[in-house]
């Protein structure tokens, strides 16, 4: 989860609660889980690539769909896409993104929506203007972290 609220407010709440001798381990654990999700997502993408295409992340072309922190907005504050892009690049992937609401992100420009040009399409933010059935049809492998492909039956689609 991203945005200005959920990733940051639990840490403030935990800090404030400790001033009053309240235990905050559950709040801190929730923050840790949220912070570690990009690592888990990278692992799911790697598995999808290995099993779906018999290909590793290194040298693969990955298209991130949506970099805003939530659907149908242009705000990228604390977006999980930022860390995920970094992790994929570190693994050797060539990463691009398409977001109808975000023209520039992390030194990149939003590319044309051409799923067939990539080894894997990763749905990070489920913007309602995107045709997910068409994307699945044209893509090699789709990893859907937002359940945007619900109701679409395809062996190409990997979900959490």
Task: Please give the residue ranges for each predicted region.
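Structural/interface elements that position substrates and couple domains in central-metabolism enzymes
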Residues: 1-160
């Amino acid at each position: 989860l991203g945005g200005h609220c959920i990733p940051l407010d639990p840490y403030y709440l935990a800090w404030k609660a400790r001033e009053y001798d309240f235990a905050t381990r559950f709040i801190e654990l929730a923050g840790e889980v949220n912070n570690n999700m990009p690592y888990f997502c990278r692992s799911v993408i790697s598995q999808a690539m290995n099993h779906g295409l018999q290909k590793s992340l290194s040298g693969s072309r990955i298209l991130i769909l949506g970099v805003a922190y939530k659907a149908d907005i242009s705000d990228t504050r604390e977006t999980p896409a930022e860390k995920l892009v970094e992790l994929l690049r570190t693994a050797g992937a060539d990463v691009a993104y398409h977001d109808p609401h975000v023209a520039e992100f992390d030194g990149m420009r939003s590319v044309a929506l051409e799923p067939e040009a990539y080894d894997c399409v990763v749905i990070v933010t489920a913007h309602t203007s995107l045709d997910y059935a068409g994307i699945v049809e044209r893509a090699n492998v789709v990893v859907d972290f937002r359940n945007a492909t619900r109701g679409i039956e395809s062996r190409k689609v990997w979900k959490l």
